[in-house]
């Protein structure tokens, strides 16, 4: 288990080298990243890469804020860490990122059915300590009811994240989002992954036109229809151009977070291609 000092240690000049222009908009569109894209790096190496990429607003992957628990770690061990870790661990990350010009606008903390009330509450405390106004969650549909009171109390919106595989109690279809939001407060929202949505054979633009007030973040990736593979931006069926153009035309300040998942040669090189592709659309 990492100590805060080890977890956050870095060369003295790292934050300065990562500094980027503090304007999060590009031609009126917020183009950021889900730091899961840089999952092959620790929290400090991730920050350095963001500086190289000139990305200044992120949705933070929980793996960049929590220890790298080995596969198979008992849930009770993870829960114990979450319930006992000082919040200063998260405020230190926030300061390091903010000092480098990077805003953490969302925190990825995936509430599941086996989360205790205390563990749910801590997720909102972590988000607040990071300065995040949004939590994104690869959650269960039924868990929304349990999360809602905590979201209302914290006044932090929770964007439920979809995948492409259509199974009971998981988010994939428009109806799954509707079921989760039905009867809930305005704090239960949508984190729309447009690549997964297309892979499940749904139209992201059509969905956005109807539900944009409840969409708090978007994940940008390219996939083929019919549960197709993740591919380089522009090689799949995902209407990335149409989504970003719609956001620009309608002046939607919804963070569009690049999530790099296809197989490339070098992470930073591939993410740079993704960034350039998105920026070229809205330029």
Where are these regions (language model features)?
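Catalytic-core regions built around general acid/base machinery
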Residues: 82, 88-96, 146-153, 242-246
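Flexible loop residues that form catalytic
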Residues: 63, 112, 140, 163, ...
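Short beta-strand segments at enzyme active-site cores
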Residues: 58-61, 104-107, 136-137, 256-258
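The substrate-binding groove and active-site-proximal loops of carbohydrate-active enzymes
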Residues: 37, 79-84, 108, 133, ...
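Glycine-rich, proline-tolerant flexible connector loops at the mouths of alpha/beta enzymes
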Residues: 61-91
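Residue-level recognition of beta-strand->loop/alpha-helix junctions
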Residues: 37, 61-62, 108, 162
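Histidine-acidic metal/acid-base catalytic patches
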Residues: 2-35, 39-57, 171, 178-192, ...
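Active-site acidic/histidine proton-transfer and metal-coordination neighborhood
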Residues: 11-12, 16-17, 23, 96, ...
